[in-house]
Amino acid sequence: MVRLQEQYQAEVKQALRDRFGYDNVMEIPRLSKVTLNMGLGEAVRDKKVLESAQAEMAEIAGQKPILTYARKSVAGFKIRDGWPIGCKVTLRRERMYEFLDRFINVAAPRIRDFRGFNPRSFDGRGNYNLGVREQLIFPEIDYEKVDAVRGMDITITTTAKTDEEGQALLEGFNFPFRK
């Protein structure tokens, strides 16, 4: 079992049960998935951008990303329906816990001027969204091979019913929230 998963089973689960007074063990919030998304508007002009972004995301996530396509044509963005405009990967189970462990303990401290993540970025249903400005914070990415600095969106989906429960769950994993 992964370190973060063991921590959840041993400490976080009981702490959440004590704090919120759940009657049923299935009520206790848990992580369900982590989604990484990279929107690449410049991929319209250069297909190599998409390939390198896919390779970098595969390195970061440990899983091959899928391409995302434009749902409709937008003249202002110079895109047509069905053109590839990004890539995403959904992590579950062990890979999700491994990624989150690396993100919290290695990648997040490497963010420039990092003082913690905003605790207001919950969506009202216990899920947390954050953006990363550069992929270089991940140790898997070789600085020499990077052709452009790209950011990504990270969504942490939980089974929590409220933002307070979701925040308590992530704090149990030592997620660095701003005070």
Swiss-Prot record:
Please indicate if the UniProt record lists Transferase as a keyword: no
**GO BP terms in the entry:** translation
Summary of the function given for this chain in its UniProt record = This is one of the proteins that bind and probably mediate the attachment of the 5S RNA into the large ribosomal subunit, where it forms part of the central protuberance. In the 70S ribosome it contacts protein S13 of the 30S subunit (bridge B1b), connecting the 2 subunits; this bridge is implicated in subunit movement. Contacts the P site tRNA; the 5S rRNA and some of its associated proteins might help stabilize positioning of ribosome-bound tRNAs.
Which one of the record's GO molecular function terms can you name?
A: tRNA binding
**Source domain of life:** Bacteria
The name of this protein is Large ribosomal subunit protein uL5
GO CC annotations on file: ribonucleoprotein complex; ribosome
Source species, please?
A: Alkalilimnicola ehrlichii (strain ATCC BAA-1101 / DSM 17681 / MLHE-1)
